[in-house]
Amino acid sequence: MLAEVVLTPSEGKRLIAKAIAHMPIVKLAKENGTVIVATSTTNAYVLEELLGKEIKEKGMFTAGVVTKDGLQITEAKGRGDHTVIQKGKVKTVKVPELGDILKEMGPGDIFIKGANAIDPFGQAGILLGGIGGGTIGAAWGYLTSNGITTIIAAGLEKLVPINLTDAVNRMGIMKVDIALDVKCGMMVIGGYIITEMEAFKELFGVDVVPIGGGGIDGAEGAKIFLLDGEDEAVKEAVAMVKTIRGEPKLTTRTIKQK
């Protein structure tokens, strides 16, 4: 059976979150190991699905953010912190505390991160607006040296048609001459990238082909997908899409740039 569905960016985030919470490796680490959910707007949805609790200001579950005004930094007041789930117990931490937790983690544990870009070569790019590289700057050494499983939650709206390594070589806070907002560098990382395509596959076992994108009247950034699979699986996928239709768009509060 074939079905066409359209997902807005917010609906895509919800789908991705449901899939990550459904992954056996995440379920196992949540109960028997450690899961770190780093701040990002997509990860606000992930945290809701993992904990079964609403995050009222999902647009504040991030430090750096892209808005209609460009690359911005969220206000410190009301900004979400990274969340750690250790054997079912939940706590929040800030960047300086991550190292003490990460150094004890290993392959059976999970670090979930959002991204600003993904490329066709399995790489994810994270914009760095602060000296030292923020969250990923503090975490990446531990993730790679300890073999911690990294899951990258990113909708196909983040897909760019280049090798991100080429972008990194051109970028840097001290390289950019002019910026209308926050100057950025970039770090390229690897891991299990979960887009809407992987999410549908994880949840329903259907094949997914993106067949279009964009829209107006609230569908800006939307993606159109063709779902292909057994009748019951496709019907279940479509039924789930109906439940997330109308997922509200996110808003945030940012620091006024000079």
What are these regions (language model features)?
Residues 2, 6-22, 26, 78-249, ...:
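Conserved phosphate- and dinucleotide-binding cores of soluble alpha/beta proteins
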Residues 3-85:
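N-terminal active-site beta-alpha-beta segment that forms phosphate/nucleotide-binding
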